[in-house]
């Protein structure tokens, strides 16, 4: 075991526009090279596009998208006697949300098109409607866990 003291988790302050911690977490994950103002502009513009297209509260659509993408189980590699098993594990809520945000942003970046604003908006709308690449990733993760259910007794 490491003797190093574990860093304290600092609370994420809510964002100033929607007063949501989830939005703030997304801005921080969207940010590249310390350009937080650019990341926040991209997300807020994407939320405006969502409002125009769906005629719904953009925060509600965003939260639904994140909830739909959040995985419940994942597999972790565990070595037992020279063999590596993919052991299904339940995902803690904070890790699940972090994975969901990471996947939404990653698959937004991979979408074809020019502006990140429209790509992010489209991915969020798709995720809220339970379609899109981020949802496929979650389904794939759940399938992997289901396929390796036999190794569940190796949990640690």
From Swiss-Prot:
| Name of the protein | Small ribosomal subunit protein uS7
Q: Which gene encodes it?
A: rpsG
Briefly, what is this protein's role? One of the primary rRNA binding proteins, it binds directly to 16S rRNA where it nucleates assembly of the head domain of the 30S subunit. Is located at the subunit interface close to the decoding center, probably blocks exit of the E-site tRNA.
Keywords (alphabetical) are: Ribonucleoprotein, Ribosomal protein, RNA-binding, rRNA-binding, tRNA-binding
CDD domains, alphabetized: uS7_Chloroplast
Cysteine-cysteine disulfides: none
Question: Which PROSITE patterns does its entry note?
Answer: RIBOSOMAL_S7
**Regions that span the bilayer:** none
Q: Name one GO cellular component term.
A: small ribosomal subunit
Q: Which GO terms fall under molecular function for this chain's record? A: rRNA binding; structural constituent of ribosome; tRNA binding
Q: What does the entry give for GO biological process?
A: translation
InterPro entries this protein is in? Ribosomal_uS7, Ribosomal_uS7_bac/org-type, Ribosomal_uS7_CS, Ribosomal_uS7_dom, Ribosomal_uS7_dom_sf
- Keyword Ribonucleoprotein recorded: yes
Nucleotide-binding in keyword set: no
Q: How does it assemble?
A: Part of the 30S ribosomal subunit. Contacts proteins S9 and S11.
Instruction: Report the sequence similarity comment from the record.
Output: Belongs to the universal ribosomal protein uS7 family.
One Pfam family, short name please? Ribosomal_S7
Source taxon at top rank: Bacteria
Report the source organism. Answer: Acaryochloris marina (strain MBIC 11017)
